[in-house]
């Protein structure tokens, strides 16, 4: 959460080599030591106290199960979204690859289009997050934008700098 740059400023950063040194149980403590007191939503101490239990609950949830559950959810809320003109905008997985063995399902153009086809309704759209999608340098973001044609309901523009394989900062 606070990688120190040569000029003394700090940036958000992700380095797979650092992630590979920890496990879900000690992740909170490890990241807390490096965050300068900052906290991300979902990283609250009361949630992190249950991390081992939560990982156990999701150990058998593969990409297919996760995707099917997402489609089920989006179809279930469709009537309410249409009634109240609510635009849902799914945020891509960040980073765009599995972490600690947890499946990722919204990582690239193929997966975004698959979801738009599975729930083909105006309320169902995308948050175009250039950081999440850009975490995989093979994602062609301009092509993704063209492919989504009107299904982008929100944009979250981030500026990534690559430092190496699965290592970036913003």
What are the residue ranges of the model-derived segments?
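Structural preference for beta-strand elements that scaffold enzyme active sites
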Residues: 85-89, 123-127, 151-156, 163
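Glycine/charge-rich catalytic "coupling/switch" loops of P-loop NTPases
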Residues: 130
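Active-site acidic/histidine proton-transfer and metal-coordination neighborhood
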Residues: 1-125
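Gly/Pro-rich active-site loop or hairpin
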Residues: 67, 99-113, 133-170
């Amino acid at each position: 959460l606070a990688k120190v740059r040569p000029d003394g400023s700090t940036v958000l950063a992700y380095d797979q080599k650092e992630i590979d040194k920890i496990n879900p149980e000690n992740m909170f403590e490890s990241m807390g030591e490096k965050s300068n007191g900052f906290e991300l939503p979902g990283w609250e101490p009361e949630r992190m106290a249950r991390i081992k239990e939560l990982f156990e609950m999701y150990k058998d949830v593969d990409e297919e199960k996760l995707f099917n559950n997402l489609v089920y959810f989006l179809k279930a809320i469709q009537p309410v979204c249409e009634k109240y003109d609510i635009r849902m905008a799914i945020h891509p997985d960040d980073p765009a690859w599995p972490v600690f063995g947890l499946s990722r399902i919204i990582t690239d153009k193929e997966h975004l289009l698959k979801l738009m086809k599975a729930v083909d309704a105006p309320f169902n759209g995308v948050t175009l997050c250039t950081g999440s999608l850009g975490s995989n340098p093979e994602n062609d973001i301009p092509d993704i934008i063209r492919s989504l044609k009107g299904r982008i309901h929100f944009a979250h523009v981030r500026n990534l700098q690559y430092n190496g394989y699965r290592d970036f900062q913003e």
